[in-house]
């Protein structure tokens, strides 16, 4: 059973009691079969993928080993690399799918595991259930997922690599969530539908979350009727898509006439055209700088072709409040590399999937630079009176704190030139830390290697305790080590005991390197270990936030193998960090699923016994 039932694309979602709705994910459609002798993972075209995604097949063997009476069982679903509850990273999945060497596959599986999202049940206890109704199959799947103690809905921070896609009764309820998380779309399924092998059936309808972009027409192929459309990227007109679908006959005729009169015909017969004519297109996602599933909307004769920028495409790629406006996009804000406000906003949009989880439920403090990084700056933690209603906030009884959990709030703050985002160690409804952060602060940028040495010494110590730590550049001159904790697991008093223990060990074992002296003049060019900074009311620069310096450097998470003498903070800027994530993933990808409660509790227990 390899060839799967397929949904039909619809331009309007079906509404009614006879329909249920599921999130549509951008991944590899697969059949997962689990039986007593092993596991198989097969693509919809019959390609065996078990060895390509060992984190799924290996987990499947253990997840269902105590449910032998349920075997053999067969699940229909999607292999994805989750970014958030409604969206997957198809670009990373494609890279992963092309790997052939077992060692490279395992390395990628460890660094950024993919997961199988089950949305249908085809076989249970060896019995074919495809002829049961959709609702009955879904109920049976929920029972199975519950018995196996697997996530009932997609969770990018869960350790389990088999999860479930739930169904919703109401389209509007789910569509709001899909828009919020920038998901691919929704699949509507008839409640009485059977699962039909090798069929594309109108019992399943897919409704996609298309975006709109403005492009410049720069080429035309008369042989197939496709337009080449381009945008300004780094000052160069760069092709971003080929499009034919959606064009009316009269529009095609007009383009052909324009090309023949004003274009240049190449030896191959294709035409090129100097930038002049703008158009609006619809697309689904951006993959490696190219628009996917593109269709033509119409000409935009009132636009100037210089408005068709890649940054404009990125700005329109995320769901934001209709009242959000951007101003002075050409203002230079990072002087040394001449980066504009538009460049900054583009970076924040592209990094938002990795930044926002660390801002979630935190009372954020921003540092604003109204005239760019060379100008005066000021801190802001309260929501100003002039902020629009859509800007999120939290009232603690005395102050209205800014809370930044969505794109609209994030981009409003960016438009106010909030270049730095600082967060406390606890969430808005807690007085207990959600992580420990050890701040390694060398005397100057020229002394950064001291931070590298200090970080590695601390890693050896933490490893000896059985504690996993995560390094991050401060974005200025230092390194910060993160230790994740479960919510409400420890008090600040307890974490202070631990950070003080670390500080005392370091200053005693390496007196020439570390100091806890708060007065700069008394530090004698040693690295300052600020264990007092980890306290209620204190803040730390958020992962992936920019810093307000002339380069626009980023507080970038690191892999431990990168923390060596060749590490150069100046190379981690808004120009490089996005490409880095696309190629290497996020070093903090499993941060929230890896709390270090057990080893920390053991250390605190020993400290208590000694006292």
Curated annotation (Swiss-Prot):
Binding site for ATP: 22, 29, 44, 78, 119, 200, 206
Annotated segments matching region DNA repair polymerase domain (Pol): 325-564
Ranges annotated as spanning the membrane: none
Listed Gene3D superfamilies: DNA ligase/mRNA capping enzyme (3.30.470.30), DNA primase, PRIM domain (3.90.920.10)
Record function comment: With Ku forms a non-homologous end joining (NHEJ) DNA repair enzyme, which repairs dsDNA breaks with reduced fidelity. Probably involved in DNA repair during spore germination. The preference of the polymerase domain for rNTPs over dNTPs may be advantageous in dormant cells, where the dNTP pool may be limiting.
Induction pattern: Transcriptionally regulated by SpoVT and sigma-G factor.
Native species: Bacillus subtilis (strain 168)
InterPro entries: DNA_ligase_ATP-dep_cent (IPR012310), LigD_ligase_dom (IPR014146), LigD_Pol-like_3 (IPR033652), LigD_pol_dom (IPR014145), NHEJ_ligase_prk (IPR014143), NHEJ_LigD (IPR052171)
Protein name, UniProt field: Bifunctional non-homologous end joining protein LigD
Positions bound to Mn(2+) 1: 26, 184
Binding site for Mn(2+) 2: 439, 441
Domain of life: Bacteria
EC class (word): ligase
EC identifiers of the protein: 6.5.1.1
Entry note: cofactor: Binds 3 Mn(2+); 2 Mn(2+) for polymerase/primase activity and 1 for ligase activity.
GO MF entries: ATP binding; DNA binding; DNA ligase (ATP) activity; DNA-directed DNA polymerase activity; exonuclease activity; metal ion binding
Subunit structure: Interacts with Ku.
């Amino acid at each position: 059973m390899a060839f799967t039932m397929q949904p039909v694309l619809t331009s309007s979602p079906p509404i009614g009691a006879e329909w249920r709705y599921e999130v549509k994910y951008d991944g590899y459609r697969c059949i997962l079969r689990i039986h007593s002798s092993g596991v198989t993972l097969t693509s919809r075209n019959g390609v065996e993928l078990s060895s390509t995604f060992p984190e799924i097949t290996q987990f499947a063997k253990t997840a269902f080993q105590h449910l032998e009476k349920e075997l053999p069982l067969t699940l229909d679903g999607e292999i994805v690399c989750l970014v958030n509850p409604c969206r997957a990273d198809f670009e990373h999945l494609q890279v992963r799918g092309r790997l052939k060497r077992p060692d490279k596959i395992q390395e990628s599986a460890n660094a950024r595991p993919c997961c199988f999202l089950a949305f249908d049940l085809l076989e249970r206890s060896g019995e074919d259930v495809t002829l049961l109704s959709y609702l009955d199959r879904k109920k049976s799947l929920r029972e199975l997922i519950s018995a196996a103690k697997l996530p009932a809905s997609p969770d990018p921070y869960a350790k389990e690599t088999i999860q479930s896609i739930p169904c919703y009764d109401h389209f509007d309820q789910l569509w709001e969530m899909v828009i919020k998380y920038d998901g691919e779309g929704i699949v509507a399924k008839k409640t009485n539908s059977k699962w039909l092998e090798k069929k594309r059936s109108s019992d399943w309808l897919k409704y996609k979350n298309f975006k709109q972009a403005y492009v410049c027409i720069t080429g035309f192929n008369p042989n197939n009727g496709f337009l080449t459309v381009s945008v300004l990227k780094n000052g160069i007109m760069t092709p971003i898509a080929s499009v034919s679908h959606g064009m009316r006959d009269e529009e095609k005729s007009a383009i052909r006439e324009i090309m023949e009169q004003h274009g240049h015909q190449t030896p191959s017969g294709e035409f090129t055209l100097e930038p002049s004519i703008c158009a609006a297109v619809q697309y689904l996602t951006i993959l490696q700088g190219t628009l996917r599933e593109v269709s033509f909307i119409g000409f935009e004769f009132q636009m100037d072709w210089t408005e068709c920028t890649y940054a404009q495409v990125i700005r329109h790629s995320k769901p934001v409040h209709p009242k959000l406006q951007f101003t002075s996009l050409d203002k230079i804000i990072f002087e040394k590399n001449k980066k504009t406000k538009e460049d900054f906003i583009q970076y924040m949009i592209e990094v938002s999937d990795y930044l926002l989880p660390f801002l979630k439920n935190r009372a954020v403090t921003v540092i604003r630079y109204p005239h760019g990084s060379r100008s005066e700056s000021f801190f802001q933690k309260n929501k100003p009176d002039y902020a629009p209603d859509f800007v999120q906030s939290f009232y603690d009884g005395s102050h209205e704190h800014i809370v930044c959990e969505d794109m609209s709030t994030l981009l409003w703050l960016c438009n106010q030139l909030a270049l730095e985002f600082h967060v406390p160690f606890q969430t808005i409804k807690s007085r207990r830390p959600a992580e420990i952060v050890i701040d390694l602060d060398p005397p100057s940028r020229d002394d950064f290697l001291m931070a590298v040495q200090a970080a590695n010494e601390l890693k050896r110590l933490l490893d000896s305790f059985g504690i996993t730590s995560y390094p991050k550049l401060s974005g200025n001159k230092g390194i910060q080590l993160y230790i994740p904790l479960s919510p409400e697991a420890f008090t600040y008093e307890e974490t202070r005991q631990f950070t003080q223990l670390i500080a005392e060990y370091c200053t005693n074992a390496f007196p020439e390197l570390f100091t806890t002296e708060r007065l700069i003049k008394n530090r004698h060019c040693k690295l300052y270990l600020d264990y007092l900074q980890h306290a209620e009311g204190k803040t730390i620069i958020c992962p992936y936030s920019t810093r307000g310096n002339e380069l626009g450097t980023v507080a970038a998470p690191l892999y431990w193998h990168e923390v060596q003498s060749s590490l150069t903070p100046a190379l981690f800027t808004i120009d490089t960090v996005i490409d880095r994530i696309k190629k290497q993933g996020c070093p903090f990808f499993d941060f929230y699923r890896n709390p270090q409660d057990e080893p920390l509790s053991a250390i605190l227990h020993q400290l208590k016994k000694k006292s």
